[in-house]
Amino acid sequence: MKGRLCTWGSMTALMGAFCVAPCFAQTLTWLGTLDYRSSIATDVSDDGSVVVGIAYTPNYDFRAFYWRNGRMEPIAPPRWLGWSQAYGVSGDGNVVVGNMMDSVGYMVAFKWTPSAGVEFLGALGGVGGTALAASYDGSTIVGWAEARNEDRLAFRWRQGQGMQALGAPATSVATGVSADGSVVIGYVNPPGVLLAFRWTEAEGVRMLTGFGGSNIAAQAITPDGSVIVGYADYPDHTRHACRWLDPSQPPQDIHTFSDSDSSQSTATAVNRDGTIIMGQYWPSSGVFSRPFRWTPQRGMEDLNTVYAGLLTNGSSLFNVAAMSPDGRFIVGSGFNARTGRREAFLLDTRVPCRAHSGDVDENGCVDDADLLAVLFAFGQTGQDLGRVDVNCDETVDDADLLTVLFAFGQGC
C-alpha cells in the first residue's frame, strides 16, 4: 500500500497532485513487416508487451516474428534460411511456438525462448507438425503432429514429458490450452466436416455440439478452461460465432448482426471470464473480413467503428487473432494506409483515466456512496482502478479520500 493517512498540514501538497496526475490514451500501433511485403499478428502476451506473428516476403515466403518494446525481430537466427511461422506465445511472453523448416526441409513444431533459442518438439511417428498455443508459463504446448500414416494428430507437449497424442478420432488439431495446461481444445476433421472437442486428462476427448450444420470449431479458451469460443454452422451453411459455457450443452449464438448485413462470423479470442469475445465477420456486401468485439451488453460491434478515431484515412482492420485476458490488448492485421500494405497491429483499448472532483459514481452528488467506494478500494494499485482512483495516480490512497471529503455534499 502506497502512502498513509496524512496530517491536515499536508493537504495542499496532496491536492496539488490532483492537477498533475497522468492520463492514458487508447493507441493503435502498426508493428511493421520486417521490411517484407506484409505481416499478421497471431498472439499477444498477457501484459501486451510481446506480440508474435508472421511476416511475408514479396515471393510469399514467410518468417516468424517476435515484437517487443517497439521492435520487430525474426525468430530464427540470421543463418536460418528456412520458412518459419509463429502462432502462439505464453502468457508471460517468454515462450513462442509455431512451425519452422528443419535442416531437411520439413515444417516441424518448435518452441523458442530469447535465452535458449529454437527447440524442435518432435512428432508422433511422422515428420511434420505445428505448435499453435502455449500455457501461461510455456511448459505445456499444443498443436498437431504427423503420425506414421501422415495423418495429423492433436498433441499436448509438456516440459520433461515430451509429446503426447490426445486420442482424438480421425485427423485432429489442438488449437488452444488453458493457462495451467490441463484443458485443451481443438477439432477433428473426418472427411468433409469439422467437429470441435474439449480434452482433459480425466475425461479424454469430449465432443462439443453445435447448431446442426456440418462444421464446428473451438478456437479459443479462457485461462481457467471454463469457457470456449469458436464457430458453428447451421444446416443452411450460415456460420456464426458462438460461446460454450458448458461443454455438455449447445453453444450460445453470439452473432447479433442481421443476416442482411452478415451471415458469417467466427470467434477467435476470449477474455478471462468469457464476457468479451473477439473475432471477425464477413459483410454481405464486402470482400474483406472485419473484426468484431462482443459483450453481453452491446452485442457485436465493428472495431473499425468503435476505434475509428485511431485509424488514419484509408486504413482499416481486417481481423482479430488474440487478446489479453483482461481484454485490454488486441492483435490482428489490417491495411495501413500510410505504408500501403497489410500489417500486424496492436490495439491498446485502455480507457483514459480522467481525474475528477470526487463524484465517483457520477450521480451528480458527492455523498457517502462515493466515500465508501474509495474506502473499500483503499490501498489498491494498478492502471485500471476506475473512478475510485480519483486523481489517476494508479493508487487509491489518502489523496483520493481527501478529494472526496473536501467535495462532500456538493451537488446533493
Describe each PLM feature range.
Residues 9-22:
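Bacterial N-terminal signal peptides
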Residues 23-354:
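Conserved "turn/edge" positions that cap or connect secondary-structure elements
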